Amino acid sequence: MPDFKELKNKIKHGDFQFVYDELKKSDFEYTLENIEKEFSSVDNRDMFCYLLYVVSNENTPKYTILLCDYLMHSGTFFYNRETVIRYLLDNCLVKSGNDITLIEWILSMYEYNPDSPYNEKEIANFNRIYDSLK
């Protein structure tokens, strides 16, 4: 089990590679619940930067969704977060193709959300893609 006190301090000081390596060695399960449990005292900006670092190393739907969930549910610290979320999702969609988990997440968060970064036409297109994948 990693020393989370040390890892929190390393995140605070921007030593993301150390934290990434330690968590990888310990098979840490990156979930929003685990992040909030183990790193609750870490500043939101620092945690966002660390999770962005994780995505830069492993740009997968799992980590992209985790980062987007973090932005949605863990105390937003900037305006227009949806612009950043859309960038992350679009980038991962390009890399991963039409990954069903990404499309499900987009639809679950934004299909009926007036703050959606996606317009109605784009949401309709995601619905068509989703229907073709299931």
Language-model segment annotations:
Residues 20-36, 57-74, 97-112:
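Amphipathic alpha-helical repeat scaffolds of TPR domains
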Residues 1-47:
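Terminal domain-start segments
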Residues 1, 107, 111-114, 134:
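Intrinsically disordered, low-complexity segments enriched in charged and polar residues
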Residues 33-41, 72-84, 111-123:
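Short coil/turn connectors between adjacent alpha-helices in alpha-solenoid helical repeat scaffolds
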Residues 6, 17-23, 45-56, 81-94, ...:
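Alpha-helical repeat scaffolds
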